[in-house]
Regions:
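Cleavable N-terminal signal peptides of Sec/SRP-targeted secreted and luminal proteins
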Residues: 2-20
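GH16 jelly-roll
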Residues: 20-381
């Protein structure tokens, strides 16, 4: 009896020791694929190595909206545009007219309201659920993919690492980023945006003597009281590769550490930029000086606001648009549209003989033109 009692007490003591090794983390999580219970410091709270495409974890967006930048792609859920092969997720561009016919782009009506839950249009803004093509405003000429964890996983504070290879091809726009689960401080950019990695697929896009295509990646924070007042120039960082050895040549690790004191970005464990919260993002953006009388949307939040809420993960391959590719940059063959053009998508499509060969769509299932993601991992602080 004494031996049994001793064993019970010993095992209970061991359990206390094991439990005491968990140092509670300031990280918070939510969602169907988020861990339950106490979050411990250093705990891995999300991981996908892409042994398969988990649709419960990654929701596909279905929209024509253009990402707020009048981009030229139609995001859809099909295995031509998103698939897993040999442990890698591919987000792949295809040509819309390959399935609809060329005439449909200038005369057809595309309605993407679906009857099944997974087929519903996810963003109706900017005619995102239905468009009618005309000779001057073609229906989105490219199909691509955008996936997100909005329902499955969101977190506040932690470290995220994504190993990815950016695509090669003119006017391709890969992005890995985070958006707020709830717009606690209002619509964009009042509730913030965290861009872990953005790049351009052009091999030889040059501005002011610098390759801003595949040899450059960027990380950015967006924040401000309204779209016309955005403090991102104070929190935008870029890193360039060695000339001739762009980020499209191999997989690279893109990571950030997000704490109650700030956000720091890394590429292959090398610092790309850091944002310390200081007295807050209102002061960082200088909004009181730039727009006197504007109300601070974060006045009732913490000093880290708007980056004191849970964010979810997004990965996508966009194409073109009227914001990200500067008109003043030089590119072999030129740029077929201007950012101020009222028919930018049409101009882009009409210039396809210039850019389409650079995508190499007929080689190796166009993997070179795809955003390739090896893994996504998130740890608690």
């Amino acid at each position: 009896m004494k031996l049994l009692l001793f064993a019970v007490l010993y095992l209970g003591y061991q359990g206390i020791l094991v439990n005491s090794q968990c140092v509670p983390s300031v990280t918070t999580v939510s969602g169907s694929h988020a861990p339950q219970g106490q979050i411990c410091s250093g705990q891995m709270i999300f991981e996908d190595n892409f042994n398969d495409l988990d649709h419960g974890r990654w929701q596909h967006e279905t929209t024509l909206a253009g990402g707020g930048n009048w981009e030229f792609q139609w995001y859809s859920n099909n295995r031509s545009n998103s698939y897993v092969y040999n442990g890698v997720l591919y987000l792949r561009p295809t040509i819309t007219s390959d399935t609809t016919g060329e005439a449909f782009l200038t005369s057809g009506t595309l309605n993407i309201h679906g009857g099944a839950p997974a087929d519903q249009c996810t963003n109706p803004s900017f005619w995102g659920c239905e468009r009618t093509g005309t000779p001057t405003n073609v229906i989105n000429p490219i199909r691509s993919a955008r996936v997100r964890t909005v329902n499955s996983f969101a977190f506040r504070y932690g470290r995220i690492e994504v190993q990815a290879r950016i695509p090669s091809g003119d006017w391709l726009w890969p992005a890995i980023w985070l958006m707020p689960k709830y717009n606690a401080y209002g619509t964009w950019p009042a509730s913030g945006e965290i861009d872990l990695m953005e790049s351009r697929g052009n091999r030889h896009l040059v501005q002011n003597g610098v390759n801003i295509g595949v040899e450059q990646v960027g990380s950015t924070l967006h924040f401000g009281p309204y779209p016309g007042l955005n403090g991102y120039p104070t929190a935008h960082f870029t890193r360039n590769s060695i000339t001739g050895n762009g980020f499209n040549r191999a997989f690279h690790r893109y990571s950030l550490e997000w704490t109650p004191q700030g956000i720091t970005f890394y590429v292959d464990n090398m610092l790309i930029g850091s944002v310390n919260v200081g007295s807050g993002f209102w002061d960082r953006g200088g909004f009181a000086q730039h727009a006197p009388g504007t109300e601070n949307p974060w006045q009732h939040g913490s000093v880290m606001a708007p980056f004191d809420q849970e964010f979810y993960i997004i990965m996508n391959l966009a194409v073109g648009g009227t914001n990200f590719f500067p008109d003043g940059a030089t590119n072999p063959g030129g740029k077929p549209w201007h950012n101020e053009s009222p028919q930018a998508a049409t101009d882009f499509w009409n210039g396809r003989n210039q850019w389409l060969p650079s995508w190499n769509l007929n080689e190796d299932f166009s993997r070179e033109a795809s955003l390739q993601v090896d893994y996504v991992r998130v740890w608690a602080l």
